């Protein structure tokens, strides 16, 4: 209780006990915040830990392998279309690294070209990386676009059901890899605390 400055500790095994405190800090971590966008919870991979980064890498490797055996068409396009949602530092860094990784993979598959691979960075605000100057943000956008990685500003993901991407601009396409970096929230462990 805050009034008595005591906390009840309830371990997984054993009896609970009271602990007094002057200041209490609860660091239960954070989880990916997906917003109520249809398909995101089922389709998107977060980017908060090494396991998620490995899942993104593995999906890219698998998609390039599969796509290299297919003729040009909708299925190959879906496998080679990569979406990152969120234009903060995590999203922009992930996006740039994915573009670089794709370029290195193209060299291993003679049936695929740079133009076969499609990237989309989706950002709801009118700029990326709000932590830096506008000049730096614009430079990063220009650099990404020169590398074949366009940025969609003032654009929201409205649906990702079954990998069918729908944007607030009316644009739609299919993707087999959606990376979600658009936010975090406190761990649900804290949902019943004051």
Where are the regions that the model predicts?
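Rossmann-like NAD(P)H-binding beta-loop-alpha module
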Residues: 58-114
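Residue-level recognition of oxygen-bearing side chains
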Residues: 52, 90, 156
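Short, flexible active-site-adjacent loop segments at beta-strand->alpha-helix junctions, enriched
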Residues: 30, 88, 125
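Short glycine-rich anion-binding loops that position phosphate/pyrophosphate groups of nucleotides
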Residues: 29-32, 95, 184-186
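FAD-binding core/adjacent interface of flavoenzyme oxidoreductases
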Residues: 1-81, 179
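A Rossmann-like FAD-binding core segment of flavoenzymes
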Residues: 1-4, 99-194
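Flexible, glycine-rich phosphate/dinucleotide-binding loops
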Residues: 33-34, 91, 128, 188
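Loop/helix-junction capping segments adjacent to catalytic residues or to phosphate/diphosphate-binding pockets
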Residues: 54, 92, 130
